[in-house]
């Protein structure tokens, strides 16, 4: 699958855009996930500030704190086919904080978070240990495919 079969609507909804990964980076990271699919894939990637992420986490998950990534799968109406998988929302401040706290290169952690969020759109989860182990293994494999050596484990809020 070529990268042009993965379409990303990149929304930059944060005040400070300096140092963010560019569209091409997100495109390559997401394309690595979907390289086994032989169909067109579309998703929205929205980068937000901590205030918006806090609100989204509270509104949708009833958690009164911000988080690093949220995923919102799209389910088309019955009988309708759509290449749209859903939305991945990433919090700039939390991802940058985690990167520094864990001493992980910024690009590596951004790649990890978009991969993590995209896997949620495909139905992967980490609610129970068995699912978490599988999801982390898939994340590591994709990160290696993207040229990153390790995958840090990030506590999910």
From Swiss-Prot:
Organism annotation: Blochmanniella pennsylvanica (strain BPEN)
UniProt enzyme class: hydrolase
Alphabetical list of Gene3D superfamilies matching this protein: Metalloproteases ('zincins'), catalytic domain
GO MF terms held by the record: metalloendopeptidase activity; RNA endonuclease activity; zinc ion binding
Biological processes annotated in GO: rRNA processing
Stored HAMAP family: Endoribonucl_YbeY
Keywords for this protein: Cytoplasm, Endonuclease, Hydrolase, Metal-binding, Nuclease, Ribosome biogenesis, rRNA processing, Zinc
Task of the protein: Single strand-specific metallo-endoribonuclease involved in late-stage 70S ribosome quality control and in maturation of the 3' terminus of the 16S rRNA.
Cellular-component GO terms for this entry: cytoplasm
UniProt keyword Zinc, yes or no: yes
The keyword Metal-binding appears for this protein: yes
Gene that this sequence comes from: ybeY
EC number: 3.1.-.-
Subcellular location: Cytoplasm
Protein name: Endoribonuclease YbeY
Main localisation: cytoplasm
Cofactor(s) listed in the protein's UniProt record: Zn(2+)
Domain of life: Bacteria
Record text on cofactor binding: Binds 1 zinc ion.
Annotated positions binding Zn(2+): 116, 120, 126
Family, similarity comment: Belongs to the endoribonuclease YbeY family.
């Amino acid at each position: 699958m070529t990268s042009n079969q993965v379409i990303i609507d990149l929304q930059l909804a944060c005040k400070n855009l300096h140092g963010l990964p560019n569209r091409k980076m997100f495109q390559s990271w997401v394309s690595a996930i979907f390289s086994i699919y032989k169909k067109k894939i579309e998703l929205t990637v929205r980068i937000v500030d901590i205030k918006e992420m806090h609100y989204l986490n509270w509104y949708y998950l009833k958690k009164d704190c911000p988080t690093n990534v949220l995923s919102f799968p799209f389910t088309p109406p019955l009988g309708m086919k759509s290449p749209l998988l859903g939305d991945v929302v990433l919090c700039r401040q939390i991802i940058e904080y985690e990167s520094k706290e864990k001493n992980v290169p910024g690009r590596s952690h951004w790649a990890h978070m978009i991969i993590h969020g995209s896997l949620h759109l495909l139905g992967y989860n980490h609610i129970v240990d068995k699912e978490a182990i599988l999801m982390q293994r898939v994340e590591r494999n994709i990160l290696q495919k993207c040229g990153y050596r390790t995958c840090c484990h990030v506590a999910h809020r």
